[in-house]
Every structure is written in C-alpha cells, then in structure tokens.
From Swiss-Prot:
Name by which UniProt lists this protein: Glycerol-3-phosphate dehydrogenase [NAD(P)+]
Gene: gpsA
Keyword NADP in annotation: yes
Main location, first listed in the record: cytoplasm
Record's subcellular location: Cytoplasm
GO MF term list: glycerol-3-phosphate dehydrogenase [NAD(P)+] activity; NAD binding
Source organism of the structure: Nostoc sp. (strain PCC 7120 / SAG 25.82 / UTEX 2576)
Cited PANTHER family: GLYCEROL-3-PHOSPHATE DEHYDROGENASE, GLYCEROL-3-PHOSPHATE DEHYDROGENASE [NAD(+)] 2, CHLOROPLASTIC
Keywords of the record: Cytoplasm, Lipid biosynthesis, Lipid metabolism, NAD, NADP, Nucleotide-binding, Oxidoreductase, Phospholipid biosynthesis, Phospholipid metabolism
Binding site for sn-glycerol 3-phosphate: K82, G110, K165, D218, S228, R229, N230
GO cellular component, as recorded: cytosol
Enzyme class: oxidoreductase
Database matches in HAMAP family: NAD_Glyc3P_dehydrog
Family to which this protein belongs: Belongs to the NAD-dependent glycerol-3-phosphate dehydrogenase family.
Record's catalysed reaction(s): sn-glycerol 3-phosphate + NAD(+) = dihydroxyacetone phosphate + NADH + H(+); sn-glycerol 3-phosphate + NADP(+) = dihydroxyacetone phosphate + NADPH + H(+)
Length: 307
C-alpha cells in the first residue's frame, strides 16, 4: 500500500491521539502546533490529508493561513474539531469548505475519549463526506484492529452529533453532581438526544445519523465519563463552583460552553424547542442554580413524548 502523508494540525490530546493512530498504520505523519518549531508551510508540504484537531476558536485563522499556501488540488481536508463559530454559526467543516470550495472535506467524529485511545482500548468512529472516495481514503488511513472507522454520507449530521452532545454532557455532569440517580440520567440523555435531532434537522442533517456512533454513541460516552471536560464543567457547577473557577483550572477547552450560547441563539430565531439546552445556558450564565434548573425542567407543561 502506498504511504499516505498526513499533516495533523493541533498537538493537544486529540491531535496527538490521531497522530499516533496514523503512525501505527504506517502513514507518514507531521504535526503542527502553535507552540511548535516547525512552520505551517513545512508541515503541509506534500500532504495527502490535512487533519485539523485545533480548538474551534482557531479554525478560521488557520484555514485562512493555509489558503495562502495553495495546497495541492488533491489534498483532502479532515476536521476533527467539535464546536460552532459564534459569529456565523458555521460548523468547522463549513469553515474549511468555504476556504477550500474545490477540495473534499471529511468530518471525523465519534465516541472517542483520547485517553482510552492512547491506552489502545478498542474504539470506533465515523468519517463523513459528500465525496465518498475521500471518506474511504481517510477510513483506510486510520482503521486498525483497535480503531474501527465507518463511513457516512451525512457530514452535517455526523459533525453536529459531536458538537451538540457537548451541551447535554454538561447537563449530565450536573445530574451526577447532584446525585439524581440512574432514572434521571436516562431521561436526561434520551430527551437530550431529542433536542439534538431537532437542531440537526433544522440544519438539514438526517435523523438516523443521530442514532449512530457520532450521535448517540458520542453522547453516551461523553455523558458517562469523568474524562470529558464538558461533563466536568457540569459536575463542578453542581458542586458549587462558578464557571470562571472551573474554566480557569480546566485542562483544554470545554467546547460545550460556547456551543450552548450559539445553540440558544439559533433556537430562539428558528423557534426550536430545546428546554435542556436552555437551562444549561441559564446555568452557565449564572441565572439559575443547578437545583432551580432541574425544577424548571420537571415542572414544564406535560405533553406527549412525540409530537
């Protein structure tokens, strides 16, 4: 098999995990980070695949820098970032596609806690693109006996699954922090998935995608793991800490904090009912306590499960 050259942008926990997976498969891998010594131009030289694992706030800046470097027309761009751009409500793949309209863009997302992947524990993920051959190329580059990669033709749904679940993960952390029990956790995750589908449908995503690895799978992993930064935000809020205190000591970025604000803005514009997300937003803003948020959710008007 011909060696594939992969440039990984971002040397955080997720970027490093993906780099190790690619190296283990015999690919030629270069890693770029803001704090590293190598230039972006050098890291991108001859890249077949450019994979972005940088935080949401840096996506557009880095994509714009790469534009000026004129990458090869055959280069495949892969985004493994989860979040939304507040100013435009763009997803990471939409930013990459707007900067490189003639290149294939692939979304990589799934229930992938980097610490477990680094321990070689088995995991699965999804790569999605409107260009099937591009998704298949990325699938081949990363699939192994410990990391199973599926393809999917719905990049919007796959990307939103990984993005939207971060907000529900904050709520899940609150649930566990308040010791509300298994019944409450099951209700929260299930109704949270309903909100994810509502928002995703508004974006044009397919409902069935949210019941796959990148939706329900990622939701279950993130809502049940103390390794998740978003979960930790909720858990510590339930313990009485302020958001500022939590973020100051949090290793890495909890994308759900910013995503929540963008989602509430969108939902109010489009009249989408997302009560859990609304209460997470109010909690993050300091408008309600965790207990008050719970009470407001439980005392909403009763209604059918599906409508």
């Amino acid at each position: 098999m011909q060696e594939t050259t992969i440039s990984i942008l971002g040397a955080g926990a997720w970027g490093a995990s993906l780099a190790n997976l690619a190296i283990a498969n015999g690919n030629r891998v270069r890693v770029w980070s803001r704090r590293g010594s190598e230039t972006l131009s050098a890291v991108l030289q001859g890249a077949d695949i450019v994979l972005s694992a940088i935080s949401m706030k840096g996506v557009r800046e880095v994509a714009s820098q790469i534009q000026s470097l004129t990458p090869s027309p055959e280069t495949i761009f892969v985004t493994a970032t989860k979040g939304l751009e507040p100013e435009t409500i763009y997803t990471p793949s939409q930013i990459w596609q707007s900067c490189f309209p003639h290149h294939p863009v692939v979304v990589l997302s799934g229930p992938n806690l980097s610490k477990e992947i680094d321990q070689s524990l088995p995991a699965a993920t999804v790569v999605a693109s409107r260009v099937a051959t591009a998704a298949a190329t990325v699938q081949l580059a990363f699939s192994s006996s410990r990391f199973r990669v599926y393809t999917n033709p719905d990049p919007v749904g796959v990307e939103l699954g990984g993005t939207l679940k971060n907000v529900i993960a904050i709520a899940s952390g609150v649930c566990d922090g308040l010791h509300l029990g298994t019944n409450a956790k099951a209700a929260l995750v299930t109704r949270g998935l309903t909100e994810m589908v509502r928002i995703g449908n508004c974006w044009g995503a397919k409902t069935e995608t949210f019941y796959g690895l990148s939706g329900l799978g990622d939701l279950l992993a993130t809502c049940n793991s103390p390794l998740s930064r978003n979960y930790q935000v909720g858990y510590q809020l339930a313990g009485g800490e302020t958001l500022a205190q939590i973020l100051a000591k949090l290793p890495g970025t909890a994308e759900g904090v910013n995503t929540c604000q963008v989602l509430v803005q969108l939902a109010r514009q489009q009249n989408i009912v997302i009560p859990i997300t609304e209460q997470v937003y109010r909690l993050l803003q300091g408008e309600v306590t965790p207990q008050q948020a719970l009470d407001e959710l439980m005392l909403r008007d009763i209604k059918p499960e599906y409508n």
